Amino acid sequence: MSGTSMDGVDAVLVDLGAGFAPEAEYHVPYPPELKRILLELNTPGPNELHVSALAANEVARLYAQAVNTLLKHQGRPARDIVALGAHGQTVRHQPALGGEVGYTTQLLNAALLCELTGIDVAYDFRARDVAARGQGAPLVPAFHDALFAQHEASVAVLNWGGICNLSWLPPRSLGSERVVVGFDCGPANVLLDAWCEEHTGLPFDRDGLWAAQGQIHHALLDQLLAEPYFHRPPPKSTGRDLFHRGWLHAQLESCFGADPRTPRPSACDVQATLMELTARTSLDAVRAQSQRSVAAQSLIVCGGGANNTALMKRLSALCQSDPLLAHLQVSTSAQWGLGVHLIEAMAFAWLACQRVRGECANAPSVTGALGHRVLGALVKA
């Protein structure tokens, strides 16, 4: 798995016949030059087809490096692996265009990945849902539902990757009336990381320490919260197509004007405001869903953002100050024995398993697709 944060490739080995406990993991960071190219491909540019094809090859090589190294460390031959679920790197996500079927693009040369690993590769999971007029995202709520199936009470899961998405898992006692809900809430780490790198040279704000030194700029926060996406009802999905560095700078200019002499918040204050944006939009989504559905008893946070201590503290504080959400037990997936950075990679192992079995893996109540569909294509080794 390589997500919107574009920090690298997360590989995880999972025996889905014996529950969901991961056996091993390995991470390969993206080389800076590849990350630069992938970020540029999020917006139109010259010679895109050629650049995209070469980038897809490089992504496949990094995936293969992660898989082969993980298996070597475990002493496991490729023949032991039933399938490799590979997401690829999203560079465009436009699931609906003027009411017509849109597209979603995850760069990955799956044939090359198959060749380099000797393992069957399941990939391109989002396209089938988009073809069925769905959003193609988020796909993880269906996996979250399987992962937390043993919990009788209603569970909410926030996945803080580059983008934040919410999974709402009602109690199983509802039977046929039970409907899993999920949608993208807005930016999680994507803007925080971009601003941090731009102003400190660091790829991310470790533990939110830099943001914690700043003050929330409420006029800027109001400007950011006015983004129409936050007020759209689900099903909905988003990504770097909307929330990128250019969007943030446009919001700053709209709030403070183009004149550099106009007083602006410090870079640290902007970081604090972006952290508040993530916490607020996440909780706004949880609150709205609480009013539409059976109230959740637990709020589980996963993804890289769950490692941001300051952000987690702010999320908990906002919950405690909200009468509708004060009862929520807020925790990270690590407190449930599942590493926060492993959940999404595990989801694509599960999606690969569903593809090999020929079983449906989307949740139409989440994506808005016309019905349940078998997701992904398969390259045989």
Report residues per predicted region.
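Short glycine/proline- and acidic residue-enriched helix-loop micro-motifs
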Residues: 40-55, 202-208, 261-264
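Phosphate-binding/catalytic loop of phosphoryl-transfer enzymes
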Residues: 96-104, 111-115, 119-203, 374
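Active-site metal-binding loops of divalent metal-dependent hydrolases
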Residues: 4, 89, 162, 304-306
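Catalytic phosphate/nucleotide-handling subdomain of diverse soluble enzymes
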Residues: 7-18, 170-172, 194, 280-370
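Short glycine-aspartate micro-motif
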Residues: 1, 80-85, 155-159, 182
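Short beta-strand-loop/turn "lid" adjacent to the catalytic site in phosphate-handling enzymes
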Residues: 45-108
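Phosphate/ATP-binding catalytic cores across multiple sugar-kinase/actin-like superfamilies
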Residues: 62-70, 268-295
